[in-house]
Structures are given as structure tokens and as C-alpha cells.
């Protein structure tokens, strides 16, 4: 019984340390970008940026696959698409603008979607 209690405590402490290391290893802006993406983008663009989110199937035109749509695009172009919506960059007006994001959030999100598209 003492061994089982020790094992449970050791496992709990090891798991807590592992989770703490994960959050330290991932830059804060990347964590923020992942959260923003999950809340604002996943429903249309999908978790992996393939344009296959659950709401995306009902949109016309379909949401873009970042691997295709971001190829050759500058960070400024991507930021403008995020803050101004699709029509701000000559793309689908179905994508809404996210003008309330801070500059740091937009930069982090640009990096995040570029990573998804790579």
C-alpha cells in the first residue's frame, strides 16, 4: 500500500513536471496563436489549416488550404487577410475581418498559419 501511494505521488509529480516543461518549451506567443486559431479559425479552416473545418463545408467558396493559398504570400499579405478579411486581399469576402486582434496577436497568428501551411 505504501508502494502504491508512493507510485501515485511520483506519477503525479512527474506528470506535473512534464506539463510544466511543455508550457515553458512552447513560446507564449505560439500558445496564444494556437488558442486564437482554435477559437476563431478552426471552424472554417480546420485544425490543420486544410480548409476542412465543420462550418467550411457549407461555405461557397470553400475555405482555403493554407498549404496552397499561402504559398509565396508575404507576412504582410497574411496579416492583412487576417485583420481585413478575405476581401482586403482580393480573396473571398466570406472570410471576416479580425480587426480587434493586437499587433502581437496578428504576428503570432501569421507565424502559426504559415507553420500549418508548411
Residue ranges and their predicted role:
Residues 34, 50-80:
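Gly/Gly-Pro-rich "capping" loops immediately C-terminal to redox-active cysteine motifs
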Amino acid at each position: 500500500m505504501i508502494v502504491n501511494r508512493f507510485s501515485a505521488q511520483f506519477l503525479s509529480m512527474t506528470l506535473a513536471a512534464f506539463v510544466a516543461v511543455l508550457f515553458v518549451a512552447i513560446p507564449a506567443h505560439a500558445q496564444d496563436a494556437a488558442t486564437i486559431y482554435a477559437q476563431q479559425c478552426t471552424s472554417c479552416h480546420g485544425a490543420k489549416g486544410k480548409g476542412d473545418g465543420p462550418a467550411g463545408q457549407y461555405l461557397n467558396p470553400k475555405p482555403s488550404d493554407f498549404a496552397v493559398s499561402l504559398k509565396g504570400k508575404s507576412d504582410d499579405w497574411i496579416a492583412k487577410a487576417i485583420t481585413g478579411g478575405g476581401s482586403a486581399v482580393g480573396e473571398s469576402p466570406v472570410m471576416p475581418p479580425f480587426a480587434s486582434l493586437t499587433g502581437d496577436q496578428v504576428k503570432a497568428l501569421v507565424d502559426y498559419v504559415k507553420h500549418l501551411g508548411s
